[in-house]
C-alpha cells in the first residue's frame, strides 16, 4: 500500500512540475512575442523613413532624417542585443533542444532566426550601427542629386566609405570568411561565391544552347 502511495505521490509531483514548466515556457513565449513586436515596430518605422527619403521627402531634410534614423537604429540594436533579450531567446532555444516544450514549427524557426540575428548584431557596437544607418541615409540623398547632375565625383566618396564599412562589419561577424561570402550569406542564407558560381554554370549550360 505504501509503495502505491509513493508512486502516486511521485506521479502527482511530476505532473505538477510539468505544469509549472509549461506555464514558465508559455510566459517566456509571450515575452518573446512582445520582443518581436517591439523590434518589428522599429524596423517598420525605419523602412517608412527610408521610403520617404527615396520618394517625396524634401532633399534638404536628408541630414535630419539621417540623424533620426540613426537614433532609431541604435534603439533597435540595443533592444535586439540587450542581455535580457538575448537570455530570453537562449532560454527558449534551450527548451527546444532539451525539454521539447516548444513544438510549434513556426515559433521554432522564429526563435532560431532571432537568435542568429542577435549573434550577428552583438559583434557590432551600437554606435557603429547608428553611424551605418546615418551613412547610408546620407549616401542615398547624395546619390539622387548626383544621378540627376551626372556627377559621379560627389557620390564616389560615399561608395568608398560604404564598401570599407561593409568589409569591417564582415570582419566582425566572421573573420575567417571572405567578406563577399559573409554578405552573400546575409542576403541569401547558405549562399557563397562558390555555390553561386556553380549555380551560374548550371544556368549557363541550360540557357546558352537555347539562345
Regions found by a protein language model. Name each.
Residues 2-159:
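N-terminal helix-rich structural modules
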